[in-house]
């Protein structure tokens, strides 16, 4: 499959870059390799169901532990350090979390692709964008009405760094795990 080669290559390249930049050590590599083996076992339809289910449960546990930064072997890079965007905002920090990112890349690299074509992108956007916009308006309005937030619109200098990191390092991983692995396998079981 073409998408497996692309995502598998991205996963391997990310791990190599992590080792070269001293962001991943041998324990981190071993944990990701084990995770890949577990994901691969879940996909093997010729194996006994018990082994596939046990591998899936272990993959979920290891994925959550990696995403929660409970497994050593990763030296995540702090790219934003205690920045306050306004006088009333709390300080904000952001990391490039390789452990969480590699969970998503491993899922995509082993055959759990989310979207395979531009046509599928269009379909997904048509079905989710209206829900997203309504949810955004309702939540923002409620938050404002109850006094949890106040409008202080600005376009901070770190927006593009924040958006890129959030998209690549957070959204891709979470979508791959929750939709590409968990939801897909629960759907198969049910």
Positions of PLM-derived features:
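Hydrophobic transmembrane-helix microenvironments that flank and shape a buried ionizable site
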Residues: 170-176
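C-terminal ends of transmembrane helices
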Residues: 1, 38-46, 113-120, 178
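Juxtamembrane helix-loop-helix connectors linking adjacent transmembrane helices
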Residues: 73-170
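Alpha-helical transmembrane segments in multi-pass membrane proteins
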Residues: 3-107
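Short, amphipathic, aromatic/basic-enriched membrane-interface segments that mark the entry/exit
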Residues: 1-4, 19-26, 125-129, 186-190
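Membrane-interface helix/loop boundary segments of multi-pass membrane proteins
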Residues: 176-190
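Membrane-helix interface segments
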Residues: 4-6, 155-159, 190
């Amino acid at each position: 499959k073409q998408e497996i080669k692309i995502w598998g290559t991205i996963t391997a390249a990310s791990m190599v870059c992590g080792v070269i930049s001293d962001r991943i050590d041998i324990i981190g590599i071993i944990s990701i390799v084990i995770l890949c083996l577990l994901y691969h076992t879940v996909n093997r339809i010729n194996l006994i169901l018990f082994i596939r289910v046990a591998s899936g449960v272990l993959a979920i546990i290891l994925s959550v532990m990696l995403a929660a930064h409970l497994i050593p072997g990763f030296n995540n890079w702090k790219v934003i350090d205690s920045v306050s965007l306004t006088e009333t905002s709390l300080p904000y920090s952001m990391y490039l979390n390789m452990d969480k990112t590699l969970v998503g890349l491993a899922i995509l690299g082993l055959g759990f692709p989310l979207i395979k074509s531009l046509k599928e992108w269009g379909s997904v956007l048509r079905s989710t964008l209206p829900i997203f916009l309504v949810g955004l308006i309702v939540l923002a309005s409620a938050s404002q009405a109850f006094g949890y937030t106040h409008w202080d619109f600005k376009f901070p200098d770190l927006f593009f760094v924040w958006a890129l990191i959030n998209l690549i390092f957070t959204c891709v991983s979470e979508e791959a795990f929750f939709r590409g692995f968990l939801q897909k396998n629960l759907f198969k079981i049910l």
